[in-house]
């Protein structure tokens, strides 16, 4: 098995390369907050020497309540993304939910994300593939790791081989997610880069009646475990005031903890990738 390398400017995304951070905020709450959070991430990752891609959503289309905050929408969101890219010289990742969003979003951001709940939607997959952008596929909570090959095949047959696979937890009964560490290793056998969404994996879906709950206090432990697998990247969301975040605050890392958190993740990644592989199948 050879590891596929996805090139994003000077950044190389692959399971055997130094990990790339995909991080930012859950949803764009305001232009000023997005700029402030992007600046913090940019400063910390530059200081630690971690390749970095800024993440935020312009629309959270799958909220628990019709009254929940969804974001500024595509038009305003893309303006904010353009300003972040220009100001901080950062590559960008965001998610799309409708086929008509794919082309205009891909003109601004570098990686477009296929949401977990939509990962089997063929029309959306084809529209995303046709943009030629790098694709981040969130593994659905209801799919086995080996079933990701079907989504990979769809993208390949639609003409796109620039694919990243993202683990974000699996359903475990009602209102709970667990992370199958061996499942991530199984996805790595595809050769495609695998990244770990360590904050969304902390969710308790529907755990707060009209919104998702979470287990922010365990953000470090879960991410440490994932990084020990030798992954292509880590996906996290942070907020300066998680308790008052407009979406997924219970899962968000407190922004002031970002540097110490990433120091540990980098140390684990560096150590694990310094080891010689051991083939225990023989």
Swiss-Prot record:
Subcellular location: Cytoplasm
Annotated EC: 2.5.1.55
Keyword Hydrolase appears in the UniProt entry: no
Keywords: Cytoplasm, Lipopolysaccharide biosynthesis, Transferase
GO molecular function, one term: 3-deoxy-8-phosphooctulonate synthase activity
Any Pfam family the entry gives: DAHP_synth_1
Key word Protease present: no
Pathway info: Carbohydrate biosynthesis; 3-deoxy-D-manno-octulosonate biosynthesis; 3-deoxy-D-manno-octulosonate from D-ribulose 5-phosphate: step 2/3; Bacterial outer membrane biogenesis; lipopolysaccharide biosynthesis
InterPro entries: Aldolase_TIM (IPR013785), DAHP1/KDSA (IPR006218), KDO8P_synthase (IPR006269)
Domain of life according to the entry: Bacteria
Catalytic reaction(s) noted: D-arabinose 5-phosphate + phosphoenolpyruvate + H2O = 3-deoxy-alpha-D-manno-2-octulosonate-8-phosphate + phosphate
Gene Ontology CC entries for this record: cytosol
Family under the similarity heading: Belongs to the KdsA family.
Name the UniProt record assigns to this protein: 2-dehydro-3-deoxyphosphooctonate aldolase
Gene: kdsA
